[in-house]
Amino acid sequence: MDFCIGTPTFWIVGFGIMFGAGNGFFGRIGGIASEANYGSSMLPNGVPFWAFLIFQTVFCATSATIVSGAMAERTKFSSYCIYSFLISLIVYPISGHWIWGGGFISQMGFHDFAGSCAVHMVGGVAAFIGAIILGPRIGKYGKNGKVNA
C-alpha cells in the first residue's frame, strides 16, 4: 500500500518539496517530478534523472513501510492509508530536503550515508510515535507474556 499511495504522491508533490529550489526548510514545488521541471543540479555525476527519481521513490516507500510493523493489527486500513499519504507528501520530503536536498542540516556539513537518518530514522520515529498513540496490543499477550493466538 505504501508504494501504491506514496509513488504518485511523491512524484507529484514530495519530490519538489525535497529537491526543488527553495530555502533551508523546504523546496519549491515545480510540477510533477521530471528533469524539465527540476533540472539536473541534484543528480550525482552520470546518474540519469529517472534512475535518481526511482531510487528516491523507493527510499520514500521504505521510510513509510517501516511504520507498518509498529501499527500492525491496531489501525484501520483507511487510517493507515492516510498516514502513508501524509508521510510521502510531507514528512519524508521535508526531512529529506533538510538532509539531502540542500537544506539547513546539509548546509551544516551533515552527511547521511545510505539513508540511515533520512530513511530509517524518519520511519523509526514515525513508528515510535504511532506506537505511543495506539498503545499496547490489548489481548495479544497474556499476563505471563505468552502470545494469545
Can you describe what each PLM-predicted range is?
Residues 1-149:
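Hydrophobic alpha-helical transmembrane bundles of multi-pass membrane proteins
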